[in-house]
């Protein structure tokens, strides 16, 4: 009993210590990010002779016209996109729609501001309770005043010109040959290989594995996760699914902005862009009629979107560590809610610190990319010396470092945070309109995406089968047990084909 009390006290003390240290650290990071904002504006002008807009806010006076550009509304202190007029073509791809752009890109309150808002809201609730009886006496007059205030609020709309300039630059017709890389991005042959290919349409990089000597019976699409690449599959599962013994045609893509795929500097990396590039580069190009999907982490969101769009073609869904955080009913800011789940602004565990820095701080995350991604060849060389060119370490580093900050930043916000409220719809479509098998794998020691996310998916899709792999994390659920995982996949495909 005494031991249990000591452990409980230690847990509480550890939690409070984590909260206190996190508060101090992230308050400092708020200041550092603001300083880096000014530094990068000067550096961009120095190296590129152009002021590059960012998502830092600078409120301006309300106006009532946008002259056919981008309009932002102001509601309870939160700015959000109200309309885009006219919708512009994205170099042959479909038009940007409102729901494609997550407000978490430009509405990320500082920690002090966030805590202040919560405190003020709580005080307001208590004040309302105390003064309720008094307000009832003068209710009629107050209602009249409120109506007038609402009418005044509705008559004016706040435009944040910083965000307008950022989005205006992003939605212009894309020229994938322009601004191949920024000064803070890597310009090596590997990272810019897409720009030197003969493919004028700039499709995604796709690694294929075709059966030897036999006609492929079925197709399988592999989608990697965030800051990764197709090597996550081709260096692990593909060799275990030998071309000499397999009857499946395998496709592993590098997502837009990652690996060897195009990294357009003026893309918003929305869900629609990612999905349509997969459709163009795999489904249309290789004439795929029906297929299985295997997706990891962020790739699960794209897989569910594809399933919703091509329900009749999906033979099975295999999801690994799906980042599904159900948004409570009545939540006014679903994307903000998901962002705080993904990046809780905590220093412990370390993976939470990394996720928080990548998600909350545009300029700190750009600095990380400058130090790591731009110089990935140096880090790969050092890792090769230390590990004696370990193949697994090499491809993991390649996938982790070969992307641009623009791609990672927008993909994180527009896909993981921005689709929080959409996933319910996708899951309902899979549950009600698709008959394919749904299998979910999750590492028992995964600290990046909790196991609860997989069980949340099962609650939405009761027929889904969840398998928790004990003592494995977000990566080692595949890496290190690829032979076993390949056998599990073959069994899933065999069962789904019956």
UniProtKB/Swiss-Prot annotation:
GO terms classed as biological process: cell wall organization
Gene Ontology CC annotations of this record: extracellular region; plasma membrane
Positions of the catalytic residues: 224, 297 (nucleophile), 446 (charge relay system), 474 (charge relay system)
Subcellular location: Cell membrane; Secreted, Cell wall
Enzyme class name: hydrolase
Record EC number: 3.1.1.-
Record's signal peptide: 1-55
Entry keyword set: Cell membrane, Cell wall, Cell wall biogenesis/degradation, Hydrolase, Lipoprotein, Membrane, Palmitate, Secreted, Signal
MF annotations from Gene Ontology: hydrolase activity
Chain residues carrying a lipid of type N-palmitoyl cysteine: 56
Domain AB hydrolase-1: 220-326
InterPro entries (alphabetical): AB_hydrolase_1, AB_hydrolase_fold
Residues in coiled coil: none
Membrane topology term: Lipid-anchor
Entry function: Involved in cuticle development and morphogenesis.
Protein's recorded name: Probable lysophospholipase BODYGUARD 3
Native organism taxonomy: Eukaryota, Viridiplantae, Streptophyta, Embryophyta, Tracheophyta
Gene that this sequence comes from: BDG3
